[in-house]
Design a protein with these regions (language model features):
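Catalytic cores of the polymerase beta-like nucleotidyltransferase superfamily
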Residues: 1-479
């Protein structure tokens, strides 16, 4: 049994929270089920962080019975969802997602992360929590209402920005290997340091992550990617050995190689720098995934040329092909999100290449045509991709990049090429020349599209119709 430490904390609760908590106190006293607020809500209150409107309650008794009684006394009598197999109940009130569970103790079998559950005390319930900062509880009992129950010094760990487990971390992570990902996620989100024995235990138990479903691993990975400094999470994943297991394609970006005095940058660190560079400009998870995958094919395309050194020709094309494979393996969505990332990986060199030459209107038109509505995202990615430490190069790249961006804006306003579709359809071509679907239709359509993109004709119906007639005559077609 752990002797609980308590703190008198002046918590600030909203009007809705205070009303709810006092109602819970009254019902728990009536049922003789001592009740406590636990988990992330407590942690985030102490950190003055916004929380996601979900609050977990533990009672020494039946969580389901307590939830049903409370809901019956609240305005609107919210519907209670019962999960009898887990001894939990859930309902929504005043925009808050509330979950009630009876205090329990847990034990695990090695081949599964699903616990064997028994009724327990508050101390038992706190002992089963993943980290000390998540094992604190706020009492809702009349005798010590609002007191923080903190048996594992979670309050001190919050102040010291330390992440540690309440018990032996090797047992914690072996029992529930997903907690290794959660440790790295919390360290990344909160900018905490993982205590050394806890960090060592992740390395010791890394192979256990293989019993966790891919969906749960990817969910934690996405939360790391959405953090303020996602690179921290990837570095921790790499240092603990988890990265090589859960995302070997990214792990393979690591390292440098020197041949004949010529080396190349570490593509892993470069990619993480690009990812961090994006953070101030976007919370879009899929744009951040595009940053992660933009150079993913460099190991597969790396070659050494004695004259110019290391090359990665075609890595954008190979990388776009790899995107679908990676999304499928990681159980990421394979529809619009995957196609968006695939497109940005394929096009990520194009805007940068335009800054290195006398850019033509034709080249910009083609980029506008291919990028479509994703042009702004592509430009954000390309701007983040400028990671050279040479200040003069950065200045030159940025100036040239701004010039290209302005030219894109000017051409877009003039030619309206975003989501461009030629004004002449295949149906009109077939109708005009009495054709069935076939080679000639494709030739005429391609000819019109190329003429517009090259600036030979404007993007309007009359010019395109005349070009259609001319090309039809050239092909010997009659209308």
């Amino acid at each position: 049994m752990v002797d609980p430490k308590t703190h008198k904390i002046n918590f600030h609760f909203t009007k809705e929270e205070k009303f709810l908590f006092e109602k819970i106190t009254a019902v728990s006293e009536e049922l003789n089920y001592p009740c406590y607020i636990v988990g992330g809500y407590v942690r985030d209150k102490l950190l003055y962080r916004d929380f996601k409107k979900d609050i977990d309650f533990v009672c020494v008794g039946s969580g389901i019975e307590l939830a049903k009684k409370i809901a019956s006394l609240l305005p609107g009598k919210p519907l209670v969802n019962e999960f009898k197999n887990f001894g939990t109940a859930h309902f929504t009130y005043a925009g808050l997602e509330l979950e009630f569970v009876g205090a329990r103790r847990e034990s695990y079998q090695r081949e599964s992360r699903k616990p064997i559950v028994e009724d327990g005390t508050l101390e038992d319930d706190q002992l089963r929590r993943d980290f000390s900062i998540n094992a604190m509880a706020i009492s809702l009992q009349k005798k010590d209402w609002g007191i923080l129950v903190d048996p594992f010094n979670g309050m001190q760990d919050l102040e010291d920005k330390i992440l540690r487990t309440p018990t032996d971390p090797n047992i914690t992570f072996s029992d529930d290997p997903l907690r290794m990902m959660r440790a790295i996620r919390f360290a990344t989100q909160l900018d905490f340091t993982i205590e050394q024995s806890t960090l060592d235990a992740i390395s010791n138990n890394k192979e256990r992550i293989k019993i966790i479903s891919q969906e749960r691993i990817t969910d934690e990975l996405n939360k790391i990617i959405l953090a303020v400094t996602p690179s921290k999470g990837f570095i921790l994943l790499s240092e603990t050995g988890l990265l090589e297991i859960i995302f070997p394609e990214f792990y393979n970006l690591n390292g440098t190689e020197i041949n004949d005095g010529k080396g190349h940058k570490n593509n892993c660190y470069h990619t993480l720098e690009v990812l961090d560079n994006l953070v101030p400009y976007t919370n879009d998870l899929w744009l951040r995934w595009a940053a992660i995958l933009h150079d993913i094919a460099k190991p597969a395309t790396k070659k050494f040329d004695a004259k110019i050194g290391w090359t990665f020709h075609g890595h954008e094309v190979v990388g776009a092909r790899m995107t679908k494979q990676i999304f499928k393996k990681l159980k990421l969505p394979l529809q619009n999100e995957m196609r968006f990332v695939e497109k940005l990986v394929l096009l990520h060199l194009r805007p940068i290449s335009l800054t290195k030459e006398n850019v033509t209107d034709s080249a910009i038109r083609r980029l506008l045509f291919e990028a479509g509505d994703d042009m702004e995202s592509l430009l954000l990615l390309c701007n983040a991709d400028i990671t050279t430490k040479n200040r003069l190069k950065v200045k030159r790249y940025k100036e040239n990049f701004e010039m290209v961006k302005q030219k894109i804006i000017d051409l877009e306003e003039r030619d309206h090429l975003r989501n461009f579709q030629p004004p002449i359809t295949g149906e009109l071509i077939m109708q005009t020349f009495n054709l069935k679907p076939g080679r000639e239709v494709g030739i005429i359509k391609d000819h019109i599209r190329e003429a517009i993109l090259d600036g030979v004709i404007p993007n309007n119906y009359d010019a395109a119709y005349q070009l259609m007639m001319n090309k039809g005559a050239e092909l010997g077609l009659k209308n």
